[in-house]
Regions:
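Conserved class I S-adenosyl-L-methionine
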Residues: 1-40, 54, 58, 156
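C-terminal alpha-helical "lid/dimerization" subdomain adjacent to the S-adenosyl-L-methionine
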Residues: 141-191, 197-205
């Protein structure tokens, strides 16, 4: 989850339930994520909008070097308690990351882009590309426009909408804008990434894209 462009920290109130409720609901998606980008010992993995670190945990357990960045002090505090000193976790803006060029083998970002204002999403994705090795991969998970399958997709859509409303007005409006612009698939198309693998899950509500950078293309 992201805290990408909001100066306040509206996520503190969700901390007691985040790992207890939200993380388990994503357990199937996490297994798919690991199948798309299996951990390899020694690989450098960054999670942009790392939240409490749930997506990083299996990579750390497999012997990867794990890094995370988030703008929510409360989420990052929970992640630091979880990992101790075994992860390099930074409080910061995903549009201006404190990492060197071409450093990471894998850059993850789950449910991050939809939470940002539209004018910041391109800056964040360009930062992800900057810190990614030329032969590395981006693994993005976020909302998909469908078609939404009945009944599972409709139930999932209602649950997602409920969570978005809980996030507050700005959060909700950013998510609606993201979907109106084509969701994750619509967002990544102008960047001309190579789509190495793709999964649509959650009854059509969620897309996972494993991407590599087309070195011959220019960012939009």
């Amino acid at each position: 989850m992201i805290r990408g462009a909001m100066p306040k920290d509206p996520y503190w109130k969700f901390i007691p339930l985040y790992d207890l409720v939200i993380v388990p609901t994503n357990s199937i998606i996490k297994r798919i994520l690991l199948n798309l980008a299996p951990p390899v010992p020694g690989m450098k993995v960054l999670d942009v909008g790392c939240g409490t670190g749930a997506d990083l945990k299996p990579y750390g357990e497999a012997g990867c070097e794990i890094y995370g960045i988030d703008l929510s002090p409360s989420m990052l505090g929970r992640a630091r308690n979880k990992f101790g000193g075994s992860a390099d976790l930074r409080l910061g803006d995903a549009a201006h990351m404190p990492f060197q060029d071409r450093f990471f083998d894998l850059v993850l970002s789950s449910y991050t882009l939809h939470e940002m204002p539209n004018n910041r999403r391109s800056s964040v994705i360009n930062e992800m590309v900057r810190v990614l090795k030329n032969d590395g991969n981006l693994l993005l998970t976020d909302f998909h426009t469908g078609p939404i399958r009945f009944p599972a997709g409709w139930i999932g859509k209602a649950f997602i909408t409920f969570l978005e409303i809980l996030g507050g007005r700005e959060h909700l409006l950013n998510g609606l804008n993201f979907l109106a612009s084509g969701g994750l698939q619509g967002f990544i198309e102008p960047f001309r990434f190579n789509v190495d693998k793709k999964e649509i899950v959650g009854g059509g509500n969620i897309a996972l894209f494993l991407l590599s950078v087309n070195l011959g293309s220019n960012p939009p």
